[in-house]
């Protein structure tokens, strides 16, 4: 799993049937303290939301086959899923 910050919303009227009715959000991975890095390793990514996250929230991401299983099956067209909203971080 990875930490990320929700940076926006994706609206897509034409998409794979397995994505119909699912909320798509833009996320950017963050450091272990929850901060956006000054020089991000990668840009924003699209994730499917399973927990009702909103813009600006710190979230947990699951990727690959684990992300697909969140939404019921291995045939889902999903590679990245938001599986949790982070309340606090401590080291």
Swiss-Prot record:
Chief subcellular location: other
Biotechnology: Artificial BMCs can be made in E.coli by expressing pduA-pduB/B'-pduJ-pduK-pduN-pduU-pduT (in this order); pduT and pduU are optional, while pduA, pduB/B', pduJ, pduK and pduN are essential. A construct with the reversed gene order does not make BMCs. Ethanogenic BMCs can be made in E.coli by targeting pyruvate decarboxylase (pdc) and alcohol dehydrogenase (adh) to them. PduP(1-18)-Pdc and PduD(1-18)-Adh strains targeted to the BMC (PduA, PduB, PduJ, PduK, PduN, PduU) make significantly more ethanol than strains where Pdc and Adh are not targeted to the BMC.
Keywords attached to this entry: Bacterial microcompartment
Natural source organism: Citrobacter freundii
Record-level GO cellular component terms: bacterial microcompartment
Note on domains (UniProt): The N-terminus is required for integration into BMCs; a C-terminal GFP fusion protein is targeted to BMCs whereas an N-terminal GFP fusion does not permit BMC formation.
Pathway(s) this gene product operates in, as recorded in its UniProt entry: Polyol metabolism; 1,2-propanediol degradation
Residues of the BMV domain: 1-87
Name the record gives this protein: Bacterial microcompartment shell vertex protein PduN
Transmembrane feature ranges: none
Family membership noted in the UniProt record: Belongs to the CcmL/EutN family.
Quaternary organization: Homopentamer. Interacts with shell protein PduA.
Pfam families: EutN_CcmL (PF03319)
Stored InterPro entries: EutN_CcmL, EutN_CcmL_sf
GO biological process assignments: propanediol catabolic process
Protein purpose: Probably forms vertices in the shell of the bacterial microcompartment (BMC) dedicated to 1,2-propanediol (1,2-PD) degradation.
Subcellular location: Bacterial microcompartment
């Amino acid at each position: 799993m990875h930490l990320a910050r929700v940076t926006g919303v994706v609206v897509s009227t034409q998409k794979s049937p397995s994505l119909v009715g699912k909320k798509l959000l833009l996320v950017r991975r963050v450091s272990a303290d929850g901060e956006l890095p000054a020089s991000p390793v990668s840009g924003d990514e699209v994730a499917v939301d399973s927990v009702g996250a909103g813009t600006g929230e710190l979230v947990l991401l699951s990727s690959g086959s684990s992300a697909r299983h969140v939404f019921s099956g291995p045939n889902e067209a999903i590679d990245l899923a938001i599986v949790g909203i982070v309340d606090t971080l401590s080291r």
